[in-house]
UniProtKB/Swiss-Prot annotation:
PANTHER family: ACYL-COA 6-DESATURASE (PTHR19353:SF12), FATTY ACID DESATURASE 2 (PTHR19353). GO terms for biological process: alpha-linolenic acid metabolic process; fatty acid derivative biosynthetic process; linoleic acid metabolic process; lipid metabolic process; long-chain fatty acid biosynthetic process; unsaturated fatty acid biosynthetic process. A motif (Histidine box-1) lies at residues 180-184. Gene3D superfamilies: Cytochrome b5-like heme/steroid binding domain. This is Acyl-CoA 6-desaturase. It comes from Bos taurus. Keywords: Electron transport, Endoplasmic reticulum, Fatty acid biosynthesis, Fatty acid metabolism, Lipid biosynthesis, Lipid metabolism, Membrane, Oxidoreductase, Transmembrane, Transmembrane helix, Transport. The protein sequence includes a number of characteristic features of microsomal fatty acid desaturases including the three histidine boxes HXXXH, HXXHH, and QXXHH (these domains may contain the active site and/or be involved in metal ion binding), and the N-terminal cytochrome b5 domain containing the heme-binding motif, HPGG, similar to that of other fatty acid desaturases.
Length: 444
């Protein structure tokens, strides 16, 4: 056991020699009320401070008892600034005989990945092209203008209404990809400007909450496809995913829905309802319950603008129906694109892998083309995005060949597929998981 196991959090000055710890002891501090983690072989007690973590206490808590070095590097842009907040939390370091990686994680893969990150920095791949993002914002605003002009010029008949709805759904989908860029701090050097524009895009252009998105999405990036850590695989008993969950449900005789038919009812309750029903309700309730008043003000500005614009054409009730029809269309786009990279991959309990291996196990790519890039917001490069979440999306294709080479060196599968096959694989994955559930339900 290491020395200093009862060190208090918040010690600002540690007298030499600094207390040392073994992994065996560090791994015990992985509770909600007792959290340690390791960054660059330094041990930090984040128990009380985690509630003040700007990215949310859950995302940092998911690394309690582990080495979080690569996650730390991946999520933060200004490392020197962030390290100022870490100094009071420092309680010691790893014992000299201890490996830098916990639980037997592959140190060679980690070393090679960090060298790859250094190469990306040397290639200036973390520098953004401001014009790229400005043009994306401009084409979103242009679509909003075209939508209004269509109704103004042609009237509110069925055909102009449907055309306008599709234009606005496209605008909303593209705004979703754009807010994703700012949310990941990948546009401006200063985090503050990314946060400000993120609130504008997700709040004023989409009517959603930046804090809600951060809370969910950063957890997804930290622990992708890990049950109880990645909120994106929490399907609220509506679907069973991967191989472990359906078998567990089957063994326990859990049958909230006929999961052997989930690949069929997915079309009825997945793409159509996620945004207009579940997300819309969850976002509003989260802003109110958690008192995200600034986010709520931004969202109100979106709804105010929308209803001022469209009540003259449809009235109050008609505008509400029109809004939800747009959400309905956007939801299909969002669900298919976001699920094609993850739901078909490994979904399991915590395996405690290194950063590189964990991201490759949970993500796959879709072939590059101008349409695929635009349609998916460059999330067709999901592997590279997960490895380097702060890298501007227009540079992801530049690092992809080097990522592929690193995968080949270590025998890690790098999956890339055509768009249509990626979409089809979603259904195949749901069918497979449903059959695993049925077999376990009937025979185990």
């Amino acid at each position: 056991m290491g020395k200093g196991g009862n060190q208090d959090e918040g010690a600002t000055e540690l007298e030499a020699p600094m207390p040392t710890f073994r992994w065996e002891e560090i791994q015990k501090h992985n509770l909600r009320t007792d959290k340690w983690l390791v960054i660059d072989r330094k041990v930090y007690n984040i128990t009380k401070w985690s509630s003040r973590h700007p990215g949310g206490q859950r995302v940092i808590g998911h690394y309690a008892g582990e080495d979080a070095t690569d996650a730390f590097l991946a999520f933060h842009r200004n490392l020197d600034f962030v390290r100022k907040f870490m100094k009071p939390l420092l309680i010691g370091e790893l014992a000299p005989e201890e490996p830098s990686q916990d639980r037997g994680k592959n140190s060679q893969i980690t070393e090679d990945f960090r060298a790859l990150r250094k190469t990306a920095e040397d290639m200036n791949l973390f520098k953004s092209n401001q014009l790229f993002f400005l043009l994306h914002l401009a084409h979103i605003i242009a679509m909003e203008s075209i939508a209004w002009f269509t109704l103004f010029y042609f009237g509110n008949g069925w055909i102009p209404t449907i055309i306008t709805a599709f234009v606005l759904a496209t605008s909303q989908a593209q705004a979703g990809w754009l807010q994703h860029d700012y949310g990941h701090l990948s546009v401006y050097k200063k985090s503050m400007w990314n946060h400000i524009v993120h609130k504008f895009v997700i709040g004023h252009l989409k009517g959603a909450s930046a804090n809600w998105w951060n809370h969910r999405h950063f957890q997804h990036h930290a622990k992708p496809n890990i049950f109880h850590k990645d909120p994106d695989v929490n399907m609220l008993h509506v679907f069973v995913l991967g191989e472990w969950q359906p078998i567990e449900y089957g063994k326990k005789k859990l049958k909230y829905l006929p999961y052997n038919h989930q690949h069929e009812y997915f079309f009825l309750i997945g793409p159509p309802l996620l945004i207009p029903l579940y997300f819309q309700y969850q976002i509003i309730m989260t802003m109110i319950v958690r008192k995200y008043w600034a986010d709520l003000a931004w969202a109100i500005s979106y709804y105010t603008r929308f209803f001022i614009t469209y009540i003259p054409f449809y009235g109050v009730l008609g505008s509400i129906l029109f809004l939800n029809f747009i959400r309905f269309l956007e939801s299909h786009w969002f669900v298919w694109v976001t699920q094609m990279n993850h739901i078909v991959m490994e979904i399991d309990r915590e395996p405690y892998r290194d950063w590189f291996s964990s991201q490759l196990a949970a993500t796959c790519n879709v072939e590059q083309s101008f349409f695929n890039d635009w349609f998916s917001g460059h999330l067709n490069f999901q592997i590279e995005h997960h490895l380097f979440p702060t890298m501007p999306r227009h540079n992801l294709h530049k690092i992809a060949p080097l990522v592929r080479s690193l995968c080949a060196k270590h025998g890690i599968e790098y999956q890339e597929k055509p768009l249509l096959r990626a979409l089809q694989d979603i259904i195949g994955s749901l069918r497979k998981s449903g059959q695993l559930w049925l077999d376990a339900y009937l025979h185990k």
